Amino acid sequence: MKVLRAKSAGFCWGVERAIEITRDYAHQGRKPVYTDGPLIHNRQMMEKLSEEGIREVGDYQSRANIAVNPAAPGENPVMVVRAHGISPERRNYLKSLGMDFKDATCPDVGIIAGKIRLHAKKGYATIIFGDKNHPEAIGLLGYTEGRGYCITSKADIDALPALERVCMVSQSTMFMHEFAELSEYARQKFKEVLVFDTICQATKDRQTDVVALARQGAQAIVVIGGHHSANTVKLASLARLQNLPTYHIETAAELSPEEMKKFTVIGVTAGASTPEFLISEVCAKLEAL
C-alpha cells in the first residue's frame, strides 16, 4: 500500500512550545506541575505528560488541595496556561492562587487577543468566528470588554444587535473559506467592519494539504487526532468534502485492516495536537498491509 503523508501533519509550533515549557518545569524537579485544563486536546499525549508529573486541573475554586508557600515561590507548584489561552479574569484568578505562574498561550492566539483588546478600548464591538464553547474562544471573549459575540453562521450574524463599529476576528483553527464568506456578509450588514484574518498559518497549511492529498491520488484519507480537537475535526470534515472515504482515528488500533485493504493509495494527515509517535504508528501499520 502506498501512503501519502501530508507535509504539515502533527504538532504546530504553538503546541510544541507549550509542551516544551511545561516539560522544562517538570524536568527541573518542579513537581507537581499543573496545567489549567488539558494542555492540548490529545488524550494519549496527556497520558504521557501525566507520567512526567504534569497534572491537568479543572475549574477549581480554592487552594484547598494545592500546598502553596508564599515565602518560597521557587519551591511552589507551577501553574501553566495552556496553548489555547485564557481570559484576563481567569489569569488574575490563577495568579491569586499563589503558585508559580507560567503562560504557554500560543503567540498567535496572543496576537488575536491583542487586536481585540486594542479595538475594544476604541469602542469597537468584537465578532469572533468560532465555537463559543472552545477554550480559545472563551478566552478571547474576555478581552472584548463585554461587547463580544461568537458566531458560526450567517444566521448568527443576523441575530446580533445593531452594531456601528465592528472588529471581526477568527478562532485560529477555523475554516478559511467560511471566515471569508462570513466576514464579507458582516461587511454588508454593519456600517464599519474591520476584518483581521487570524486563522493561524499552521491551520491553513493543514487544510491546504488535505486538498493536496486528494489531488495526489489518495483514494481515502486517514485523519489522526483527538475527537475533541477542533482543528482535527475540521480536517476530517474538509477531507469528506473532497468526496473521499475519511477515517478520523486517535490511534493505529482503530484502523480496520479489512477496511483499509480496499484501497491502494491512502492519504494521512493529523491535527496540530497529534504527536509524531501516533502518526508514525499509523503510517507503519498502513504500509505493512
From Swiss-Prot:
Residues involved in isopentenyl diphosphate binding: H41, H84, H134, S229, N231, S273
GO annotation terms (biological process): dimethylallyl diphosphate biosynthetic process; isopentenyl diphosphate biosynthetic process, methylerythritol 4-phosphate pathway; terpenoid biosynthetic process
Location of the active site: E136 (proton donor)
Listed EC numbers: 1.17.7.4
Binding site for (2E)-4-hydroxy-3-methylbut-2-enyl diphosphate: H41, H84, H134, S172, S229, N231, S273
InterPro entries cross-referenced by the UniProt entry: LytB/IspH
Record keywords, A-Z: 4Fe-4S, Iron, Iron-sulfur, Isoprene biosynthesis, Metal-binding, Oxidoreductase
Name this polypeptide is given: 4-hydroxy-3-methylbut-2-enyl diphosphate reductase
